[in-house]
Amino acid sequence: MSKQPSLSYKDAGVDIDAGEALVERIKGVAKRTARPEVMGGLGGFGALCEIPAGYKQPVLVSGTDGVGTKLRLALNLNKHDSIGQDLVAMCVNDLVVCGAEPLFFLDYYATGKLNVDVAATVVTGIGAGCELAGCSLVGGETAEMPGMYEGEDYDLAGFCVGVVEKAEIIDGSKVATGDALIALPSSGPHSNGYSLIRKILEVSATDIENTQLDGKPLTDLLMAPTRIYVKPLLQLIKQTGAVKAMAHITGGGLLDNIPRVLPKNAQAVVDVASWQRPAVFDFLQEKGNVDEHEMHRVLNCGVGMVICVAQDQVEAALNVLRAEGEQPWVIGRIEQAAEGAAQVELQNLKAH
């Protein structure tokens, strides 16, 4: 017999029992998100989902995303309850812009050492996000990988599939000169620009946990969960049929995201004076001495979603959105793009 001690997976840093305990903890979370099309529960090799009834030519739409370095801030602050909603929002908001109804969601959670309480908190947030989006959490992967991550640090990724009627896909092809642009507010920086945000906090030596803006803790403002716009937007599409294009304002801000849904000959003219920028963005700009153009290229500056409708549909669209609890406003218009001009023009930019 060898004198070498018998090694186990746990000796190597992987706790199978912890993984199984997590699955038991989150089964109820997944159950709360269940849609009738989903077949079976957690634990199988693959998740099964039928196409919802009523579609003539259903088209599946998929998306995957993470939450960037907002996760580092969450780890530093030991605040894990809302990062799951961020993850869902980043995926489902990308699907709804083409008119798709999210069907199901899967997550990937990778860590050096699995902390069951933290992971369960994160997944509970994912479940809450799925409920807000009306999609089902059908499974995921929890990977304990010693030597790949520092201690209990973790990384997150999400994957979502939705469905849209082929004839009702929103792709921006009908956008025309004279159309109006409607904005929906963000809750804060959402899940983008956090490498810049963290650099600003570092360089300015901001005591993040003891700073308040307008009576609110800076930590709450920076960690506010990304808004999920799915249900109000699906209602807008259903009730008006007026939506020509939508842009989810993520990394790249207004300047890089609006052009993704515009025809080449269209220019979005955005009036920056049409909304009051939330204080957290002014704070970051001042502390980091950030150029105004850079602000709009990196951060959403208070705008989470932009919707394009014909001018004669503006009031109807605003009314539906307000009835859904949104606070929309007209942020700009579509004009013919001049030769070589940028596809987004920001008007009334303040001098910095």
UniProtKB/Swiss-Prot annotation:
SUPFAM superfamilies referenced in this protein's UniProt entry, alphabetically: PurM C-terminal domain-like (SSF56042), PurM N-terminal domain-like (SSF55326)
Keywords: ATP-binding, Cytoplasm, Ligase, Nucleotide-binding, Purine biosynthesis
Database matches in CDD domains: PurM (cd02196)
Cellular component GO terms, alphabetical: cytosol
Domain of life: Bacteria
One function term, GO molecular function aspect: ATP binding
EC nos: 6.3.3.1
Keyword Secreted: no
Compartments, record wording: Cytoplasm
Claim: Cytoplasm is one of the keywords in the record: yes
One Pfam family it belongs to: AIRS
Principal location: cytoplasm
GO biological process: 'de novo' IMP biosynthetic process; adenine biosynthetic process
Pathway assignment: Purine metabolism; IMP biosynthesis via de novo pathway; 5-amino-1-(5-phospho-D-ribosyl)imidazole from N(2)-formyl-N(1)-(5-phospho-D-ribosyl)glycinamide: step 2/2
InterPro entries assigned to the protein according to its UniProt record, in alphabetical order: PurM-like_C_dom (IPR010918), PurM-like_C_sf (IPR036676), PurM-like_N (IPR016188), PurM-like_N_sf (IPR036921), PurM_cligase (IPR004733)
Catalytic reaction annotation: 2-formamido-N(1)-(5-O-phospho-beta-D-ribosyl)acetamidine + ATP = 5-amino-1-(5-phospho-beta-D-ribosyl)imidazole + ADP + phosphate + H(+)
Protein family (similarity comment): Belongs to the AIR synthase family.
Record-given protein name: Phosphoribosylformylglycinamidine cyclo-ligase
Gene expressing this chain: purM
